[in-house]
Amino acid sequence: MALLSVAVLNVLVVNAGSTSLKLALVDEDGMALTVASLEQAPAGVDAVGHRVVHGGDRFRDPVLIDENVLAELEAVSKLAPLHNPPSLKAIEAARHAFPDRPHVAVFDTAFHATLPEEAATYPLPARWRQELGLRRYGFQGISVQWAAERVPVPRLVVCHLGGGSSVTAVRNGQSVDTTMGFTPLEGLPMATRSGSVDPGLLLYLLRHGHASLDELEHALQYESGLLGLSELSPHVHELEAAEAVGDERARLALAIYARRIAQAVAASAVSLDGLDAIVFTAGAGERSPQLRARVCAHLGFLGVELDPVANEATIGDGEIAASSSSVRVAVIVSREDLVIARAVRQTLAAATTD
């Protein structure tokens, strides 16, 4: 496969999640066309960009995919067993569909390569950290990067609240702290993931035979979070509807979720030595005024105050802080597809000039 000698106009973006596959054709003007399947991709694809969740220590920048890169991605998959294997399958299928087009991997972990040692280092034995590469990598960086570009303030906190949830502290456009760690399981409670829990609790379950290793992993990944708390649904909008008719389990799940998000925002303010703006993005962050209000209700001591009318009216990009708020609060629609398409063009342009 030869690199294109002409400008890359149309990039097919392949975003493979743990349970979904999203395809979009992005043109040079940033217009995106949703594509139903690889087989139905329109003519004119110049290059293909792939979102890959975990790049490990090896990949800190987008990379042109070849057989050597694929082998290294296979090795990294053990660090993200729910996310990287679907990406690899999607890469294989896309390379088969477009064998004469360049394919570029863009990593969710790359934005967090700027984490300082005090944010990235676990308080574990040095032999484990050094021999096994145990450190905090951070995830959802492509989405966070887009939000940070839209709200370019010195001290920003980005709340990515989708099926996976994280809070990231961004100083002058660079990640300095984030809630996800070695894997995307750490941090906030999520749709079905537990987020951070007492490690001693997990040892207790294993030691006393209450769960096998596989059962424990399945429970932490698929049976916990909002679903485990409510026993109803992993979806914020469904829990809000249940709460509205008096379901106490739904109320508790949403209250815990909002409280943990707010705690992470406050911790991020410590990492940033202050706070200029908060961004809500992804799924519930973009579409749940109730969740945003719940989170910000905990943050008045930081000078955060919402405009209730603007908050209720905003489904998509918008400013929702009250005029009296000392902290800017914005909603930004996540556009990972545009970030990936741009990274593909930059990577291929650099490769053709080397």
Annotated model-derived regions:
Residues 44-87, 96, 101-104, 110-122:
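Short beta-strand-loop/turn "lid" adjacent to the catalytic site in phosphate-handling enzymes
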Residues 16-17, 51-55, 161-163, 275-287:
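Glycine-rich beta-strand-to-loop/alpha-helix junction loops that act as flexible
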